[in-house]
């Protein structure tokens, strides 16, 4: 990318098309996506490169979040088809008014809390040594790092989430998220500003940590990770469990049924993506798990 940076048109009149042509001429081995990536950063110039990162990241976040929520909004509007897959099928699906109220609040949180964090992400990633230049990382590196991100975030989320169910923290920070005992897709990021900030650190923290450890983390990997993390959060709040749900393929995956019990019983199942922390720490939610813990206590006391 440095060779391209030294020769792209510095004129403010340079268009994306001009820059794409330049990338194609000087670096024909680059993929189409890599050329688009370079043209985006070249267009904004190094003086305001943080703006380029902010635009990419925030637009990706908004498009991915609401696009992924859309199938669940449709499912909630068609109970005659999808009610049989609803986990809490005794409760009515959210009304259009509830969906809209939730959307307005989430947009407020996105612009007031998440957008400033996203703008600040570029200087943080440069400070930690996280790369945004071309070429992109290979698929093996990207996959391995995302798996590590999932494990680190899940650990952070478990202990923070469990702490937020302590009385004072629950009342001051976490109570808003539990407004809906039967969650739906949009509620994945329905939270107080403080909770949004604290849980957001669990998402951006692992990439920055690995970058500090000289693990060659790339912004493309971070965007892929954030995409998958959003998918996971939205799906776990969807309120639906299908025969083809991921947790039926990967038994250690949390899934909607796992997190739905957390909202239903207001206790336990604190992990975000996996089940192992709740199993190890004895915080599995639901009457069956509670009865099992009671029987184990009686056995130890006998």
UniProtKB/Swiss-Prot annotation:
InterPro entries: Fatty_acid_hydroxylase, Sterol_Desaturase_Related. Its EC number is 1.14.18.-. Induction: Expression is controlled by the transcriptional regulator srbA. It holds the Pfam family FA_hydroxylase. Pathway: Steroid metabolism; ergosterol biosynthesis. The keyword Endoplasmic reticulum applies. Its main location: endoplasmic reticulum. A motif (Histidine box-2) lies at residues 174-178. It is a multi-pass membrane protein. It is found in: Endoplasmic reticulum membrane. GO terms for cellular component: endoplasmic reticulum membrane. The chain crosses the membrane at residues 47-67, 105-125, 132-152, 193-213. Residues 147-283 form the Fatty acid hydroxylase domain. A motif (Histidine box-1) lies at residues 161-165. Disruption phenotype: Leads to the accumulation of 4-methyl fecosterol and 4,4-dimethyl fecosterol. Displays a dmoderate susceptibility to hypoxia and the endoplasmic reticulum stress-inducing agent DTT, but does not affect virulence in murine or insect models of invasive aspergillosis. Sterol-C4-methyl oxidase; part of the third module of ergosterol biosynthesis pathway that includes the late steps of the pathway. The third module or late pathway involves the ergosterol synthesis itself through consecutive reactions that mainly occur in the endoplasmic reticulum (ER) membrane. The histidine box domains may contain the active site and/or be involved in metal ion binding. This is Methylsterol monooxygenase erg25A. It comes from Aspergillus fumigatus (strain ATCC MYA-4609 / CBS 101355 / FGSC A1100 / Af293). The gene is erg25A.
């Amino acid at each position: 990318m440095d060779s391209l940076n030294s020769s792209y048109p510095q004129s403010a009149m340079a268009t994306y098309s001009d820059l794409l042509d330049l990338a194609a001429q000087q670096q024909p081995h680059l993929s189409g996506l890599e050329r688009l990536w370079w043209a985006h950063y070249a267009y904004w110039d190094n003086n305001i490169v943080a703006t380029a990162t902010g635009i990419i990241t925030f637009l990706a976040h908004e498009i991915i979040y609401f696009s992924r929520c859309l199938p669940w909004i449709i499912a909630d509007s068609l109970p005659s088809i999808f009610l049989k897959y609803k986990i809490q099928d005794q409760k009515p699906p959210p009304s259009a008014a509830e969906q809209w109220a939730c959307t307005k609040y989430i947009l407020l949180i996105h612009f007031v809390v998440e957008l400033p964090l996203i703008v600040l992400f570029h200087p943080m990633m440069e400070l930690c040594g996280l790369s945004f230049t071309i070429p992109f990382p290979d698929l093996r590196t990207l996959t391995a790092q995302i798996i590590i991100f999932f494990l680190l975030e899940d650990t952070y989320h478990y202990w923070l989430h469990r702490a937020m169910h302590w009385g004072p923290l629950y009342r001051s920070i976490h109570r808003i998220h539990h407004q809906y005992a039967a969650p739906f897709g949009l509620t994945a990021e329905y939270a107080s500003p403080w909770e949004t900030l604290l849980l957001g650190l669990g998402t951006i923290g692992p990439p920055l940590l690995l970058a500090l450890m000289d693990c060659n983390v790339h912004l493309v990997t971070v965007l892929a990770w954030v995409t998958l993390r959003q998918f996971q959060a939205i799906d776990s709040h969807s309120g639906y469990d299908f025969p083809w749900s991921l947790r039926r393929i990967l038994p250690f995956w949390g899934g909607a049924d796992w997190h739905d019990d957390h909202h239903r019983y207001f206790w336990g199942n604190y992990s975000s993506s996996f089940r192992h922390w709740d199993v190890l720490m004895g915080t599995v939610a639901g009457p069956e798990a509670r009865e099992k813990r009671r029987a184990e206590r009686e056995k130890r006391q006998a």
